[in-house]
Amino acid sequence: MLLLKHGTIEILDQKTMYGWYELPKQEFLNGEQPEPITHYIKQFPLMK
């Protein structure tokens, strides 16, 4: 689930709602970003 909050994007685990991280909004919306958003999720696993 993606939530917009205070200019950042929080990614929450839909099953547990534990853990979240923020990416700069501009970086997330930038169509030229080299890696898809799933890359960030895989690289930084949610805290359980």
From Swiss-Prot:
List the InterPro entries hit by this protein, alphabetically: Uncharacterised_Ycf15 (IPR019645)
Main location per UniProt? Answer: plastid
Alphabetical keyword list:
Chloroplast, Plastid
What Pfam families does this protein map onto?
Answer: Ycf15
Q: Where in the cell is it found?
A: Plastid, Chloroplast
Q: Mind naming one GO cellular-component term on file for this protein? A: chloroplast
Give the similarity note: Belongs to the ycf15 family.
Name of the protein in question: Putative uncharacterized protein ycf15
Organism from which the protein derives: Amborella trichopoda
